[in-house]
């Protein structure tokens, strides 16, 4: 579980990221990203499937972020949205998708 300080919790926070943020998408996940304090939100709509599948999708996305938290820039607010294709996908595929998308969005700290 992500610490509370790293979670987007208010509706107004989500609305701000959706309204002003830039969006990127890949096969399994879409993101909205905005400059601001390091915080993350996770969404899985009913298009993903029943509650079991939606919760699994959110857990997969949260786990990727939890393990790679130190690699993400401190001035980013990011909302991850699970797409319908995430059903039945392995953790490794979700991790690969999210990390490639964050790299494309220039949200990762450059490693030397």
Regions found by a protein language model. Name each.
Residues 1-112:
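Positively charged, solvent-exposed patches that mediate nucleic-acid binding
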């Amino acid at each position: 579980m992500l610490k509370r300080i790293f979670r987007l919790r208010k509706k107004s926070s989500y609305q701000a990221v959706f309204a002003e943020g830039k969006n990127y998408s890949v096969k399994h996940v879409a993101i909205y990203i905005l400059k601001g304090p390091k915080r993350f939100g996770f969404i899985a709509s009913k298009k993903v499937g029943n509650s079991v599948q939606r919760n699994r999708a959110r857990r997969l996305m949260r786990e990727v972020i939890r393990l790679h938290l130190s690699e993400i820039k401190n001035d980013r607010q990011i909302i991850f949205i699970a797409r319908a294709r995430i059903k039945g996908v392995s953790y490794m595929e979700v991790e690969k998708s999210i990390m490639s998308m964050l790299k494309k969005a220039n949200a990762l700290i450059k490693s030397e």
